[in-house]
Amino acid sequence: MNLKEVSELRRRFRMDRNAISRIYGCFVNNSREIVSYIDESMGILPQDEAEKYLNLLKKALSGKLGKNLIDIIFSTEQVADSDEHRLLMALRDSQLKNGNIREEFYQKIINSLDLGDSNYLILLAHDTYDVPRKNKNDEMDADASDAVFSYVVCCVCPVKERKVELGFFPGDNEFHSCAGQVVAAPELGFLFPAFDDRAANIYNALFYSRKTDEIHQEVIDSVFHTTAPMSAAEQKEAFQNALSEALGDACNMELVQSIHDRLRDQIEQHKESHDPEPLELSVSDAAAILHDNGVEEEKILAFRDNCFAQFGDGATLNPANLIDSSRFEVKTADATISLDPEHSYLVETRIIDGRKYLLIPADEDIEINGFGIRVKGE
């Protein structure tokens, strides 16, 4: 799925735009026991409660593609005949109305998910979307539809204890201590099937993880029985390892600054282009950056080999997963220097009297914790 397709579905999660008739789910305690079930008609729920359910489900389609939103790809064999795909299709085709199928799905989540000591809420909803046709100007015609997209969306939300506070009890006309449990934003979720080319793709699902460095592979194994792509954090670490191992002493400040600047430029250009497809960087593209910076051919070949070993042949990477384009950070054992990437060139490395130093020009005013200071010798 691309950004436009995700955004199109996100707009469904409003009271006047969806065809969700019921909300299903269950509340699970930290002993992995179902405490209660949810089976609510959206038509009779108070509007504020219905909107809260929709907002929680909508968050399962939030975040960045390739970071929080991850493509799950089923093999042809799985789609043809597998328990995991059959269950997902049954959820969708039954419109979640079959309680036995829902229970089987709940148990897959409960038996695999590790949220520590947290209680959590599993939410499920089914929607049917009359996909508007697009005219020759790429504009949607709300009155014309060629296809119906039937899908299931799920999210898993931690349920947290609220602090004990004073509250007013109208029946007693008094204030008393009160506490309770509140539903937090989803930790994970998914959409099935995927909405590719604005149509159902039963070979794919879209998985959501709030944390980009912890994508709950245990749930992906249980529900989808497939291996997810590397998380954004894993991609970044693998890329850094491939680079540092191949380059050795050649991995210096100037080279890393240049790589960061080139990748950041690509990210900015992609953002300005409004291209809905995720930005991709091939291993050859990354190797070309090294070549442009004068890295020896032998080291470039070693880098390519390392990347193929880490990511697989023909792999493409998302530059946004490899760097933090919003900052440039330099760390030592005892200090951290963080700069606007536009000014990363200000940091230099020098060896003075046998010791390594980081140098930053201080031509303007200098402050320490808000205090303006002068430099000795000025």
Report each predicted region and the residues it spans.
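Post-signal/leader-peptide non-cytosolic segments of secretory proteins
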Residues: 8-10
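C-terminal, beta-strand-rich globular interaction domains
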Residues: 277, 286-378
